[in-house]
Amino acid sequence: MELLTNFPLLSSLAAIIFAQVIKVPIQFIVSRKLDWSLVTSTGGMPSSHSAAVTALSTGVALEHGLDSSLFAVSAIFAVITMFDATGVRRHAGEQATVINKLVIDFNRFVNEAKDFPKAAEKEKQKKLKELLGHQPIEVFFGGLTGILLTLVLAYFFM
């Protein structure tokens, strides 16, 4: 049962859960809408990916030191993950927004066309997921969440 005593792993899992759950009240404060689906969705404030990888790196640093090979690997993994969250995934989300708008505009055009034969049953279209990546501030606070949560957990459990 060494897995249950693996501090970097447990702190990463705690950071993911904390970051996902805290999205609900943050969104409620911003929009006055309670959306529990945020607990299981990607994107949003804070980034749970960033929280997880920074918690992992912080946990490894606390257990093995900043000069260890394990810390080097986890730190580079964290940098790549956070870069991807603000880069490729964010741009994919922005493209999904544009594509979804194009689909809406196209459907409106088709529905308004005079000679368009009405189908017996309209085919439902699947909307592309737009909230894929993160704004840099979301990644920053996700990373900060992971570090601070791991330090608090280390204080109580290490």
Swiss-Prot record:
Which membrane topology term applies here? Multi-pass membrane protein
The GO cellular component terms are: plasma membrane
Please tell me where this protein is predominantly located.
membrane
Q: Which residues cross the membrane?
A: 10-30, 137-157
Q: Which domain of life is it from?
A: Bacteria
Q: Which UniProt keywords apply?
A: Cell membrane, Membrane, Transmembrane, Transmembrane helix
Matching entries from InterPro entries are given as: DUF212
Q: Does the keyword NAD apply?
A: no
Compartment(s) of residence: Cell membrane
Task: Identify this protein by name.
Answer: Uncharacterized membrane protein YuiD
* Lineage per the UniProt record: Bacteria, Bacillati, Bacillota, Bacilli, Bacillales
